[in-house]
Amino acid sequence: MVQKNTFEAMKIGLASPDKIRQWSWGEVKKPETINYRTLKPEKEGLFCEKIFGPTKDYECNCGKYKRIRYKGIVCEKCGVEVTKSKVRRERMGHIELATPVSHIWYFKGIPSRMGLLLDMSPRALEKVLYFASFVVIDPGKTDLYEKQLLTEQEYEEYCDKYEEDVDFRAKMGAEAIKELLQKIDLQEEYKNLTETFEGSTGQKKVRILRRLEVVEAFIESKNDPSWMIMDVIPVIPPDIRPMVQLEGGRFATSDLNDLYRRVINRNNRLKRLLDIGSPEIIVRNEKRMLQEAVDALIDNGRRGKPVTGPGNRPLKSLSDMLKGKSGRFRQNLLGKRVDYSGRSVIVIGPNLKFYQCGLPKKMALELFKPFVIRELVKREISHNVKNAKKLVERENDKVWDVLEDIIVDHPVLLNRAPTLHRLGIQAFEPILVEGKAIKLHPLVCTAYNADFDGDQMAVHLPLSPEAQAEARLLMLSTNNILAPKDGKPITTPSQDMVLGSFYMTTRKEGQKGEGLIFKDIDEMMLAYAMHYVTLQTIVKVRRNSVNNDGTSKIVESTVGRFIFNEGIPQDLGMVNRNEDPYSLEVDLQVDKKMLSKIIDLTFRRYGNIRTAELLDYIKSMGYKYSTIGALTISMGDITIPDSKKGIIEQAEQRIDMVQDIYLQGDITNEERYKKVIEIWEQCIKDVTRALMTNLPADNNLNIMAVSGARGSENQIRQLGGMRGLMSDTAGNTIEIPITSNFREGLSVQEFFISTHGSRKGLSDTALRTADSGYLTRRLVDVSQDVIITEDDCGTDEYIVAKEIKDGNRQVEDLKSRIIGRYAFEDILDLDTGEIIVHKNDMINEAIAERIESKGIKEVKVRSVLGCKMKHGVCAKCYGRNLATGKPVNIGEAVGIIAAQSIGEPGTQLTMRTFHSGGIAGVGITSGLPRVEELFEARKPKGLAYITEIEGTVKIQENKKRNDVIVTSEDGEEQVYQIPYGAHIRVNEGDHVEKGEPLTEGSINPQDILRVNGAEGVRDYIIREVQKVYRLQGVDIDDKHIEIIIRQMMSKIKVEESGDSGFLSGSVVDARDFKMTNEQLIKEGKTPATGTHSLMGITKASLATESFLSAASFQETTRVLTETSIKGKVDHLIGLKENVIIGKLIPAGTGIAKYDRIEVDYDGKAEDDMIEAEKAQASNDSEEAEESTIISGNYESLQDEDK
């Protein structure tokens, strides 16, 4: 076996026949598998022990040699080597074919590699390979040309005609193609193609470029083209295609065995036919069948009908073993099932600390079993492991005491599926609980998106000290207070906790005991406990100064607010403490937003440990006082406004008027429909306003909605106002609204109308989940190798950050676009000229506020889009790590975080395509499909026309269309012919910028790239993606979207190659292109020219440098075909390829620079310590064993230092 951490790269190539024989331990000659009587493998069959090794450890087939002492002996009787049976997983065999056959990947792929190399069409190739036509190999003196196809009849005619011409040769089948491939002189071919390439144009040029790429690939990789035709095929080890006995004596076997048997049977039959000199036609048929059998083995179903097994099920071929969700890559290599794990239902744990979880005793015992056994032996409760095991199995009382001690400081990981972002797995300290359910802290539910209606969670146990350290320092819930997507607290209290906080900070006049004055908080608490005052009573209490200067003052507030402030830091900056050191920090009614702000301020000021304490305080206060408040809702809380009837009648009158105007022919049906919908929408608003003003402030329903605990104005409207407009099955708004509410009850017709929406809602949600998951998978794949690799790349590129607007609506302000980024240059105060922030310094909240207050509209900042790093990005271009609020560390896997941050809210985005006014027209895509459309750089539905020059607009109306003419300042004119259906959004005489849309709709990103260049398209994608997310109230930081765009724009299309050696027309890596050009300019040569290319995320994932990553993503066979011809080397730079081969990922603590850390130590002190340990160890044999290990480690360290 190959040691997995010792190799730097992995290469893939074509296997030559010699190579295949070299791998093999013997030839498989018979199709037999195992003997039906003895159940032992047949000799020379597919499971032969002589070839593949013994089926039982250290035991030969005939039984002459048993036991390990004969290791390495080959039995002279049966020929089996005495060794471990594990070798049956790694030893390969081979089959010598009687005739060459082609490899279907290289013949059938698109484009056909064999076809490109030979300059033959795939159809012609197929005819030759499957014995339908002859191909001329050497025309000799005939009037034929090389590679010409002949039918059997023609071939016979030519043979008769040129009997004496000895040179004339034509053949059929793979041997003919093999001969043609052997005749190719690659260098000569390359020279000829390069010459013809320069002079050709159009389709011909594209074809030549493709052929050039294949020829170049073969030259570079030193692969021989004739290896695409196989004389010998490998047989994979038997334990990878096992045969197992089921109860009832039948056998289950891997499909591969069937496919191999077909090949061997046909091969043996062909050998026999050749030996006895059968007629050509029979031999030919057998050769074709052999070719088809090998095709089915390699890729069943690629050509013709797939070979089927029992029940017409297509057999799984070698290619099927690799591709798709259940293939080798995605099923076994990228994610595996692990031991030391368990799962159970979750219940709420309101008494847990923020960093704790409740672990059922039985589960904990099973998970920590090895640790418990070790401890039992160590404490001499049990004398050996066997006894200790029995104690654990019997659940002896002593076991629980040991378990209690062991779980201290040993964090466990909790995971809830689906894990949409990194907060789906967090570490907690376990607390043993009775019962079988895991207890979860209520505040981490938001991050997990968990509720307690029967959700299950999985527990994993980190074993090694390193894993435990990472779990504690990086994954503990206290380190995950902020969400990585926007840097805001994700542990915000919800529901009961919000309600409790809101209730206890409510202020009411005229409550029991109002105006009482207390000497301190304790006296007030005593009064409250004895019911002299209520929570909402306004009282006065003497408070000490926050600045601890010994002064105090009487402060007025409510009892509840005094209690609430006890656990809250009193210097968060909500009160100016220089002027007022006595007031309460939070002297207002606390709703959900306010709680979030308090947590955010505490985190920025005190860090996570103090914040975790605060969270636990808010949690316990919230639960306690929402229980005391006992707020519930009843039918009586829903009051229907008296004015509702009048408002609806008024709307109906206006609609009758619109209907009359329509019937007179003054407006179109579409305009009538729009107007009706508008009238109803206004009516709904009026009813809602009447309802909400009618609701008293202390109405329980109102309290729940206003505080943010549960429900919204929208839901109250449906309960007490009117349900409003509904949509039909196609998603169009029905023009008759539901005027009743749930309090009054719906009529049959209203109920029927409302069912459309409900059913659509459910089916949309199901579809959305799948689409969102697939989008996340593609995003992860495209960005997985973006890791912070250096501190500063010293780039000279920047982006100009300004607020994002959509028409007049602000999508994102300047402040939120620059917080956490590094300034590209000194930013100056426009009035005084003093420097607000220096170049390469981070802009924090305070600086951003200052920049905005000074009226600065745009700022030059560093961005990942301008980072110079070839692999990954640098910390200065990335800026702040949103999850910690500090500068990002080297080794952070920011690509994956970006993908998760964009993908995780995907499920919240709507699926709806909004139709303009409900009449079926060209819909403008929104929601999730719009995000997908942008990231895949597709041509959008409802395409807008854009202007390619800056200038003034003139509109001319024609019979069939409108002409929009844009005239630039220097007199250049461009005419855009716009069909009547399109809605023009510019007016006569408007000034338009380059790339501005002239009509409604979405713009094709490729057009923006052409007109406004790379910067224009970057801004457009960021603006559009943010528009979709902000509409749903989801905040995502720009830098996540920028990372994806960086990957989409990582390639350049070469126009003129100059002295670079690039092929013009080919697509190359942007950073390679830049480096090559810089080098050429240094040497005084001609640099290459090219344009940025914008790829969709799927295409960008497949265009990655790493073939392992691409193959495990999609189109596995295509990727492997291409890369094996190129002889590609995967340098294992990204995360995915390292996961696949089982190395530590090059991110976090696995990054290469941490490998070389050396420990400085004072040799003498260490040696003394070891001596002391050794002395003590002589008393205790177990400790002795441990200390020798320690000293062994030190010695090896010293060797390294030397």
From Swiss-Prot:
Under SUPFAM superfamilies, the record lists:
beta and beta-prime subunits of DNA dependent RNA-polymerase (SSF64484)
Q: Mind telling me which Pfam families this protein's record contains? A: RNA_pol_Rpb1_1, RNA_pol_Rpb1_2, RNA_pol_Rpb1_3, RNA_pol_Rpb1_4, RNA_pol_Rpb1_5
Positions with a binding annotation for Zn(2+) 1:
60, 62, 75, 78
User: Would you tell me the Gene Ontology cellular component terms?
Assistant: DNA-directed RNA polymerase complex
Query: Which NCBIfam families does this entry report, sorted A to Z?
Result: rpoC_TIGR (TIGR02386)
Protein family? Belongs to the RNA polymerase beta' chain family.
Q: Name one GO biological process term.
A: DNA-templated transcription
Record note on quaternary structure = The RNAP catalytic core consists of 2 alpha, 1 beta, 1 beta' and 1 omega subunit. When a sigma factor is associated with the core the holoenzyme is formed, which can initiate transcription.
EC numbers for this chain: 2.7.7.6
Signal peptide residues are none
Keywords of the record, alphabetical order, are: DNA-directed RNA polymerase, Magnesium, Metal-binding, Nucleotidyltransferase, Transcription, Transferase, Zinc
Kindly state which reaction or reactions the protein catalyses: RNA(n) + a ribonucleoside 5'-triphosphate = RNA(n+1) + diphosphate
The UniProt record gives the binding positions of Zn(2+) 2 as 793, 867, 874, 877
Q: Supply the gene name.
A: rpoC
Q: Which GO terms label this protein's molecular function in UniProt?
A: DNA binding; DNA-directed RNA polymerase activity; magnesium ion binding; zinc ion binding
| Cofactor binding annotation | Binds 1 Mg(2+) ion per subunit.
Map out region (Disordered) in residue numbers. 301-320, 1168-1202
Q: Give the protein's recorded name.
A: DNA-directed RNA polymerase subunit beta'
Q: Which residues bind Mg(2+)?
A: 451, 453, 455
The task this protein performs is described as: DNA-dependent RNA polymerase catalyzes the transcription of DNA into RNA using the four ribonucleoside triphosphates as substrates.
Listed cofactors = Mg(2+); Zn(2+)
EC supergroup of this enzyme: transferase
